[in-house]
Amino acid sequence: PIVRLVSTRMRAADLPLRLRYEAPVVRECQRNAGGSRQFTQLGFELIGAGDTAGDVEIVSLVAEAVRELVLPDARIIAGSVRPFKELLAACEDRELAAEALRCVHANDFVGLDARVAASAEPEAVKAAISELPRLHGGAEVLDRVDALLAVAGIVAPLTRELRALVEGLAPEDAQVLSFDFSIMNSFDYYTGLVFKAYAGGLPDPVGSGGRYDSIFTG
């Protein structure tokens, strides 16, 4: 709906656009899982901010929201789809690339390792595919991402946006941020940053989002 709104009624508007929406959402719950099938979803869209300043603005907004809600042990876990997708794009084994992405979407790391072990890809590439989605921690983990990609033959600065995010956040927002490269989201339209916000005692995220430039660029 947001894409349709922007491409029709707002196509002549000055960028960037800052939009907010609130709507009821119905989702299927697993049997006996408990909880409501309908809830209110509040969302924010920043459209036309193509640089890392947009990432900083949105993550800062999420951090402020969880702080204002006084959620216990609130934290934001971020990643990027770019390193893993670029790694898979470099694979000659296209079946491995497709299966590896499916396994990460499903959090099936046993299946991922089995599929990687059966591939004839170079060992450095196979090691990177297995390890990269397991990486998590503070900003120091970004160095390990770069090292894995470099050994696999990928030298593009694919963690640059995440480093800029850390540098651009206010100290109180950076304190609740960590990284996890298993966060890929099952929607293939994401093109860079992805994130989830959690609160203590709740197994599911209270918020999530990411960058999806390609939807608006064609």
Model-predicted regions and their roles:
Residues 73-75, 103-107, 136:
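Histidine (H) residue identity feature
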Residues 89:
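Short His/Asp/Glu-rich catalytic/ion-coordination signatures at enzyme active sites or charged loops
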Residues 29, 86, 101-103:
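Functionally engaged cysteine thiol sites
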Residues 1-72, 92, 115-218:
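Positively charged, Gly/Ser-enriched RNA/tRNA-binding surfaces
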Residues 75-86:
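Glycine-rich, mobile lid/loop segments that gate access to catalytic sites or pores
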Residues 92-117, 121:
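Acidic, His- and aromatic-enriched active-site or binding-groove loops in soluble protein domains
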